[in-house]
Amino acid sequence: VNGPGDRKTYFTCAFPSSCGKTSTAMIPGHTIVGDDIAYLKIKDDDVKAVNVENGAFGIIRDVNPDDDPVIYKTLTTPRELIFSNVLVKDGKPYWLGMGKELPEEGINFSGEWYKSKEDKNGNEIPPAHKNARYTIKISDLENCDENYDNKKGVPVRGMVFGGRDSDTSVPVAETLNWQHGVFMASSLESETTSATLDKQGERKHNPMANLDFLSVPISEYIDNYLEFGKKAKNQPSIFTVNYFLKDQNSGKYLNGMLDKKIWMLWMEKRVHGEVDAIKSPIGYLPYYEDLRQLFTRYLSIDYTELSYVEQFSIRIENYLAKFQRIKEAFSGIPNLPEEFETELNMQIKRLKDARKKY
């Protein structure tokens, strides 16, 4: 994240599939080291991160010149790249939501395709698969960071965890401390999308957005996180984000596509101690005035106090229901770190105390 002057601050982010990982890495005006796997190690009192991959692999649906200009330009200009499950016509790739009219025939995942073609069950086959993908070199991106291949790594000042949550989590919050941050990351839930094989809209518990890739028991994994943080003199701050909060009456998203730029800029200021925050039951929240100034300066948007209240109100009953689900999800799991159970009980107590007070 590019801060004031020449200051550059590095963050790691973890999201389940189709929850904002690549779009966060591609925020306009900032740079990308990698969009997938990072290797973290404590070196010289800092947590250092290196990119262990040469490319970026993402969902291509809805990549268009308005919302994803850098990726779109990279995908539509000559270079080495890989497409999968797109529509091909006259040697050119097309995908859903690309911002232009699609051909009425071509080759796709069903073979020879034409408009109104149906599968064996009588369902209309779309021009391209909803989970179509692209693979490109990181170095081909205009916003590639100069340290993308730096073997010494970059210092991590913040770690961000986010999921797809339509009714509970605020857009951005800093956790109370490392221990609380590990607990919140372990409690991550996300609603399923077309990027998974599950039924869309189901809420899945996905600790650290990494459940499918764990090679050790979850209790050991959480303990590893806790111990890792204790060893770092310059401990990164842990943040939670949610780009998918909706108005429960209209069903419309409360966040714009580019709002994540503001959340990241606020985090950048936070880790450098340049903005204060409101201590809440679920972490430190931004002050309205700080966000208003960032929206005005970087997006030329008049960010209203009404929007702030809608986005950052603590939905206590929803949070309590969430942590009850987390309590049930971890019940019966042996050898959970004592710190995790302490944080869970304290989190529930803070929410109940707030309910009584407010």
Segments from the language model and where they lie:
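Short, basic, glycine/proline-bearing loop/turn elements
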Residues: 2-11, 125-133
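Conserved NTP phosphate-binding and transfer environment spanning the P-loop NTPase/kinase superfamily
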Residues: 61-64, 71, 76-358
